[in-house]
Structure formats: structure tokens, C-alpha cells
Amino acid sequence: MRICIFMARGLEGCGVTKFSLEQRDWFIKNGHEVTLVYAKDKSFTRTSSHDHKSFSIPVILAKEYDKALKLVNDCDILIINSVPATSVQEATINNYKKLLDNIKPSIRVVVYQHDHSVLSLRRNLGLEETVRRADVIFSHSDNGDFNKVLMKEWYPETVSLFDDIEEAPTVYNFQPPMDIVKVRSTYWKDVSEINMNINRWIGRTTTWKGFYQMFDFHEKFLKPAGKSTVMEGLERSPAFIAIKEKGIPYEYYGNREIDKMNLAPNQPAQILDCYINSEMLERMSKSGFGYQLSKLNQKYLQRSLEYTHLELGACGTIPVFWKSTGENLKFRVDNTPLTSHDSGIIWFDENDMESTFERIKELSSDRALYDREREKAYEFLYQHQDSSFCFKEQFDIITK
């Protein structure tokens, strides 16, 4: 089949971009023709995070309507992974909506909703029109704001006596899959190459990524024990001002200054701003423990781990995840909480950091045990969210 993957918001370089690239790879691996198109009307800071330039096609929606229409109509299945942002010019959104109206009726339109909160959802333009053109819709959680707020606004269950009730379409749950085997084959190191004293956090400068807790854990436990902490992805955005105002000790480096980073004992947290994903994974694969401390509200959690969760387990470090995330997410295989399994993952409890630290000490002092536990974590994450299972599950829904 001919597939067109369209990012109408643009190439952000974060989760939606990663999803689109993983999706493209899976389709090609399974014998389909794929075109990857993205709008260039809005610029983003992380466009170099992933390799895409050799095959992706940029369009300026405000000026290249005919080019965009030809691309999205030259397929059997059109997958829309994002819609324009509220900050784009009027011509961009007008042409995007016009595009929706002129998609060939024969094309099956699939919409993935990657945002969680209603605040983020309302920063999109043309989302309702996109949903109404869709044949298949996916979201992360049955209880999230997309399902429970926006879909109910667009498809109210009660209307006036003079109107017919419009039945809401089904919204299917999805997980963002990753080729976990491929990541392992690229980055996994022998256990003898791992520096057990390096603790490496990855995320962004947004509080739900858990950077304050990582700073706290470093100062109270890791630093006194002579261990080092590196935090990758903390950009100097407006949110970073609060870190400075709180007087949190740190040393900050740009991506080109990484060789200057001080990984000696008894140092403050070492911060790296934007990272190149492949370079980060190489560094992570030689680090004793990798931290992904996202802490979303329970209503947004159903089955989906983030890509950074999966990357930690796939590259060969011991993953450390936020405990309540694991309590609320269900394992794909048996629908039980992730924390109920002997998974090899360390579950970070901000109310009991000492137990987290004791587990880190135990694994650091026994490389054979460490090796067994990271293999366990890899297998668990593979079964939970590998491309071979999850994209197949989604494709079966798309084509049924």
C-alpha cells in the first residue's frame, strides 16, 4: 500500500517526530511505500534531534497548497500525526482546512492524537475538522482530555429537540512503538564497559519530566556517595529561570562543550542543553543508570510509555522510572500494572528515595546481577511496546 505520513504542525524533533520516523520504518519493513511530509510554516529548536533530511519532504502550507495536496492525495492511507499550531499565519490554517476538504474520498484518513492535556490540545488549529474527516482515530488514553473533553464537545450526547444526535466515532487506544531490537543492536555494550558511577537523566525543561526530583536525589544521595549526575535536554527556556532562582547547584554546557563536563565525584549536577539523539544514546549506553522521571496525571496513563523510557532499556543501562507511572500504566500483554512485574526496572519513589538509592548501590557493586537485571528490563520493554507488536496492532485497526 502507499502511505503518506503528514506532520502538519511541523518537524518538532520530539515525540511526534520520533513516532513518525518509527512508523515510516515499520511500513517500509513490511513492504509498503511511504512518503513523509511535514509543514515548514513554523520553526522548532530540536529539528536536528533525528536523522530525516534524506527522505522527508517539507512544504510551506501558506504558499505551497498545490504541492501539499498532490502529496497527501498520492496514497491509499493518509496518516495525520499533527495539525497546525495556533501561532501560524492565517494562510497556513486556511490552506490546511482546504486541504482536508479536498482529500480524495477513496483515501483512508487516520488521525493520531499525541497531546495529553486540554491546554495542549487547544493550542492546535483545525483539530476538529481533522477528526471529522478521519476514518480512524487514535489517542493515548480512554480517560484523557481528548476523549473526555474535546470529543464530547464536538459530539455532545444531548442536543436540542430540533437536531439529531451525531454519533461520536470510536477512538482507539495506541502505544507509540519503537524498534527496540534495532536500538539494542546499535548501542548495547558489554557490562564491563559501563561506568556504574554515572547517573544520566534525560528530559526537557518542564516540571512533569521530574528534573527537580533528580536534582534533589543527586544532592541528597548520589553526590555524597561519590556518584555523578548528568542531565540532558534541560534547555535555557523561560522555565529554567526557576531553577536558577531556587539556587540549585549545577554546571551548564552546550552540546559542543560536552568534553568539558566534569564527571569527577562531589560535583554538582552536570547539565547539557539540547542533545543529538544518537549521541545521547551512545553516552547512555555506557552509563550505570538512566533516569526518565515523567509523572503525568493518572487520567493520561493507559499503556503508553514514552520513547525515552524505551530507549533507556534498549541501549543497555538500567532504567529508573517514576513509580506512580508504573503503577498506573498497564502491561500490554496481560493488562496488569507495570510495577507488578519483576521487570528489572527501578521504580523511583520521591517519598522513599533511600530505597531507590539502596537498589542502585546493590546493582553497582555486582556486575553479574546488573547484567541480569538490564536483560530483564530489555525483554520487558520489548514485550510491552516494540514496533513488531504495536504497529501491527494499529495497522490491523486501520485496515479492518
UniProtKB/Swiss-Prot annotation:
Record's keyword terms, sorted: CRISPR-cas system evasion by virus, Glycosyltransferase, Host-virus interaction, Inhibition of host adaptive immune response by virus, Inhibition of host innate immune response by virus, Restriction-modification system evasion by virus, Transferase, Viral immunoevasion
Q: Which reaction does it catalyse?
A: Transfers an alpha-D-glucosyl residue from UDP-glucose to a hydroxymethylcytosine residue in DNA
What is a GO molecular function of this protein? DNA alpha-glucosyltransferase activity
- What does this chain do? Catalyzes the transfer of glucose from uridine diphosphoglucose to 5-hydroxymethyl cytosine of T4 DNA to yield glucosyl 5-hydroxymethyl cytosine (glc-HMC). This DNA process seems to occur immediately after DNA synthesis since the DNA alpha-glucosyltransferase interacts with the clamp protein gp45. The glc-HMC modification protects the phage genome against its own nucleases and the host restriction endonuclease system. The glc-HMC modification also protects against the host CRISPR-Cas9 defense system.
Please tell me whether the keyword Membrane is annotated for this protein. Answer: no
According to its UniProt entry, one GO biological process term is: symbiont-mediated suppression of host innate immune response
Self-association or partners: how does it assemble?
Interacts with clamp protein gp45.
Stated EC number for the protein is 2.4.1.26
InterPro entries per record: DNA_alpha-glucosyltransferase (IPR016223)
The UniProt record lists the keyword GTP-binding:
no
Entry protein name? DNA alpha-glucosyltransferase
Q: Which organism is it from?
A: Enterobacteria phage T4
Q: In which pathway does it act?
A: Genetic information processing; DNA modification
